Amino acid sequence: MATDIATRRFNVREFHKLAEVGILGEDDRVELLDGQIMILAPIGENHRTVVDLLAELLTDQRKGRYLVAAQNPVLIDDEDEPQPDLVLYDRAAIGRHPTPTDVFLIVEVSDTSLGYDQRSKIPVYASAGIKEVWIIDLGSYCIQTYRDPYTADRRYATTETHDRKSLVSPLAFPDIRVRLNDLVQ
């Protein structure tokens, strides 16, 4: 006879408490998704390089319009606090974790985490109404863009895949142009 295994779900307050009391360490690579503590893959050299170069490019072009955060949390709701690789968000959120209404763009860099990013994180971002998400797929060397969230269906209406030579621009800042070839060696 099969027995179902129960899981313990956490809210954001409890998740933060685990860090405060030392159960989760400062260097632990974890995030809260759908009330579950997810252990993130270690950051590889290619992943780190792309995040660093993209953060530099986006920071250089910001002109005071937004802030860039690398691998910092976004407070989605009481059960979701993911740590995207990069976030472009409104300057009004200085001093706190950005929330979905503050976010212009989320970028996930996927070296070994493509399935997790597509199946677990994209639905959370869509349900929160995050307007735009990019997944930079280092396995296929492409940028997948997700736009026009359907919150009830936890998906995006518009998805496109751009090859490494294509120029991609965030919806909120069409003057910014990103080419994957400029970020990978």
Model regions and ranges:
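Gly/Pro/Ser/Thr-rich low-complexity, intrinsically disordered segments predominantly at protein N-termini
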Residues: 1-185
